[in-house]
């Protein structure tokens, strides 16, 4: 049976680590290297991974706000596309107070259940312990306007940490868990690690920051609900590598992404409505031998601005 889980495992857009180099208003510590995003969540980089101009003298101080908006040539989440390899737009807002934060994002998607958009709501705490920047939180994913009878909303908890080896080099690791990915009855677990290197600023034009980064993640699952076949979703590894350019509030990320999913398992995992026959037949989860290109090698360009 085909699983409409594709959104759920949206692709690892892990646009991780947008280096904080280009923001004159930021402190020397922040300019060194922004946290690497190993969450794989969202059509935009996570707030703590995106450099931008600072909203100074906020009347709500010490309550801080951030805003991000942009577009991308594809929406890759944990290695698979959530936009059928079509361009997307997205925006995000976040409020933080001391260690605590809450935020929301909206992004265009193209999924089997035809939702109007992907909305995410998240919150958590970001403490610093032993020079490690931690992030413990939860995310609720909502897909309004789905086809009649479909409901793939779900929630996920996560923990991740970022550590600076030097002012220019950061490593990160994260773990996420959902009791029912895409409301399909199957639990999901996700683990990832990443590395980022900021190029020396003396080698670059004024106000330009450049970083190289990469992430490797592993996604595995339990059995789906009996109504969806009761079989386990295919576990897989994904990876990406790219370069991020930053100048003040503007950011450009160019990234290569791929997974080790076969085209047949890609269909099983995503439920791609455009899948075609011609692959290996599996009488349990793919009796027609359908194949999908939603999980293969992809080049993604992403442009956005960030106000922090």
Give the label of every model feature segment:
Residues 26-67, 77-80, 200:
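Outer-membrane beta-barrel biogenesis signature
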Residues 53-64, 113, 128-133, 149, ...:
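Short loop/turn motifs that connect adjacent beta-strands in outer-membrane beta-barrel proteins
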Residues 61-63, 85-89, 115-119, 132, ...:
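Residues that define the transmembrane beta-barrel architecture of outer-membrane proteins
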Residues 71-77, 97-99, 106-110, 127, ...:
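Transmembrane beta-strands of outer-membrane beta-barrel pores
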Residues 154-234, 256:
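Detector for outer-membrane/organellar transmembrane beta-barrel domains
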Residues 223-232, 263-291:
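Solvent-exposed loop segments that connect transmembrane elements
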């Amino acid at each position: 049976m085909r699983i409409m889980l594709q959104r759920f495992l949206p692709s690892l857009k892990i646009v991780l680590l947008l280096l904080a180099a280009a923001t004159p208003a930021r402190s020397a510590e922040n300019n060194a290297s922004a946290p690497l995003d190993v969450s794989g969540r969202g059509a935009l980089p996570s707030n703590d991974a995106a450099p931008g101009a600072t909203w100074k003298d906020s009347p709500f101080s010490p309550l801080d706000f951030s805003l991000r908006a942009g577009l991308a040539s594809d929406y890759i989440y944990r290695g698979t596309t959530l936009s059928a390899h079509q361009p997307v737009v997205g925006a995000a807002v976040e409020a933080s107070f001391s260690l605590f934060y809450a935020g929301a994002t909206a992004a265009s998607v193209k999924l089997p259940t035809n939702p109007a958009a992907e909305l995410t709501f998240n919150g958590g705490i970001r403490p610093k312990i032993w020079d490690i920047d931690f992030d413990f939180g939860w995310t609720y994913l909502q897909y309004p306007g789905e086809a009649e009878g479909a409901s793939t909303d779900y929630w996920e908890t996560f923990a991740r940490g970022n550590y600076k080896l030097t002012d220019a080099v950061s490593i990160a690791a994260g773990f996420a868990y959902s009791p029912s990915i895409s409301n399909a009855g199957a639990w999901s677990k996700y683990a990832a690690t990443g590395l980022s290197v900021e190029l020396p600023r003396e080698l670059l034009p004024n106000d330009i920051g450049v970083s190289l980064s990469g992430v490797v993640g592993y996604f595995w699952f339990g059995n789906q609900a009996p109504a969806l076949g009761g079989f386990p979703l295919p576990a897989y590894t994904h990876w990406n590598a790219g370069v991020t350019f930053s100048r003040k509030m503007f950011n450009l990320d160019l990234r290569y992404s791929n997974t080790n999913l076969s085209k047949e398992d890609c269909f099983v995992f995503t439920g791609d409505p455009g899948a075609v026959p011609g692959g290996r037949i599996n009488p349990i989860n793919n009796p027609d031998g359908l194949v999908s290109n939603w999980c293969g090698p992809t080049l993604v360009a992403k442009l956005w601005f960030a106000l922090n």
